[in-house]
Amino acid sequence: MKNWIFLAVSIFGEVIATSALKSSHGFTRLVPSVVVVAGYGLAFYFLSLALKSIPVGIAYAVWAGLGIVLVAAIAWIFHGQKLDFWAFIGMGLIVSGVAVLNLLSKVSAH
């Protein structure tokens, strides 16, 4: 269970860092740039801890999939990014795929 918490912290760090990239204006603004570097540092550190017991394929699928959906949602809410019907369908498929990997696949670490 602890390793799944590490993975959640890793996803949080990656989402914060990726979301701050837009505000950093190509690393020309100090505070958002520091958030980007710190967020990715946090993300990869905790991902490495999670990989001690979660298979890399599962961990990366969860990390990348949920990261994509959360970053898109944040961009939609805070930056006014337009998402159409098919974007929501695609995000739903990503979440469904992550759920299938974790709930039904025999390669998942439970």
Curated annotation (Swiss-Prot):
Keywords for the protein's UniProt record, in alphabetical order: Cell membrane, Membrane, Plasmid, Transmembrane, Transmembrane helix, Transport, Transposable element
Membrane topology of the entry: Multi-pass membrane protein
Record Pfam families: Multi_Drug_Res (PF00893)
Transmembrane feature ranges: 1-21, 31-51, 58-78, 85-105
Primary localization class, coarse: membrane
Sample GO molecular function, one term: transmembrane transporter activity
Any single Gene Ontology cellular-component annotation: plasma membrane
InterPro entries: Small_drug/metabolite_transptr (IPR000390), Small_multidrug_res (IPR045324)
Subcellular location: Cell membrane
Signal peptide segment: none
Family label: Belongs to the drug/metabolite transporter (DMT) superfamily. Small multidrug resistance (SMR) (TC 2.A.7.1) family.
Described purpose of this protein according to its UniProt entry: Multidrug exporter. Is implicated for the resistance to bacteriocidal quaternary ammonium compounds.
Entry-linked PANTHER family: MULTIDRUG TRANSPORTER EMRE (PTHR30561:SF1), SMR FAMILY PROTON-DEPENDENT DRUG EFFLUX TRANSPORTER SUGE (PTHR30561)
Protein name: Quaternary ammonium compound-resistance protein QacF
Organism of provenance: Klebsiella aerogenes (Enterobacter aerogenes)
Taxonomic lineage of the native organism: Bacteria, Pseudomonadati, Pseudomonadota, Gammaproteobacteria, Enterobacterales
